[in-house]
């Protein structure tokens, strides 16, 4: 069987997906946060499907890690006009890595809660990790995050001069 030998199959999968994604100049929303990622992703997928029909791609289930995200992006086809993907994490640096693969045009941080404390030293560290998706945006990207969250300033700083859209319970 013909094949290509690579030293790291996960890195190769990520690089392949990033290269594939780069061929599609479409809006791509990346959703991250401690809680509610899948729900928000599916809500956005419903909106995109109402707008674009089958021309919208979305994460299925919670394919949100270094295997699932590349597999989702490799489903992109010329018919697609928009996409929404979920980014999950359980260790430092994972959101930045996944964001580099996804190349989002819109990044949404849902929240930061006490999760993965075995890998993250504090909830503030979780907020920084989740906010890495904002730093990955190009300068014309859109950063979306909660206005009434105690970590709002972290996300403002990470999104820097990019357009910011805030949401609130109040």
Please provide the spans of the model-predicted regions.
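Acidic, Mg2+-coordinating active-site environments of NTP-dependent enzymes
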Residues: 106-170
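Short beta-strand-centered segment that lines the nucleotide-binding/catalytic pocket of NTP-utilizing
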Residues: 53-67, 111
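Switch II of P-loop NTPase G domains
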Residues: 90-101
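P-loop NTPase switch/communication element
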Residues: 59, 66-82
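Residue-level signal for inorganic ion chemistry
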Residues: 16, 31, 69, 86, ...
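Short, basic phosphate-binding NTP loop
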Residues: 1-32, 39-45, 49-51, 67, ...
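Short conserved AdoMet
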Residues: 49, 77-78, 103, 138-139, ...
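Switch II (G3) loop of P-loop NTPases
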Residues: 81-92
């Amino acid at each position: 069987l013909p094949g290509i030998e690579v030293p790291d199959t996960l890195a190769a999968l990520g690089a392949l997906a990033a290269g594939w994604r780069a061929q599609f100049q479409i809006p791509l929303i990346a959703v991250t946060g401690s809680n509610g990622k899948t729900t928000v992703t599916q809500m956005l997928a419903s909106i995109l499907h109402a707008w674009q029909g089958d021309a919208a791609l979305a994460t299925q289930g919670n394919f949100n890690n270094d295997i699932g995200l590349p597999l989702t992006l490799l489903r992109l086809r010329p018919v697609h006009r928009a996409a929404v993907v979920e980014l999950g994490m359980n260790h430092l640096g994972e959101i930045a890595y996944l964001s580099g693969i996804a190349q989002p045009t819109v990044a949404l941080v849902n929240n930061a809660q006490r999760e993965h404390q075995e890998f993250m030293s504090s909830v503030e560290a979780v907020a920084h990790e989740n906010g890495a998706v904002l730093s990955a945006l190009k300068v014309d990207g859109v950063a979306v995050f909660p206005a009434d969250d105690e970590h709002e300033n972290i996300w403002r700083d990470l999104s820097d001069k990019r357009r910011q859209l805030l949401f609130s319970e109040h």
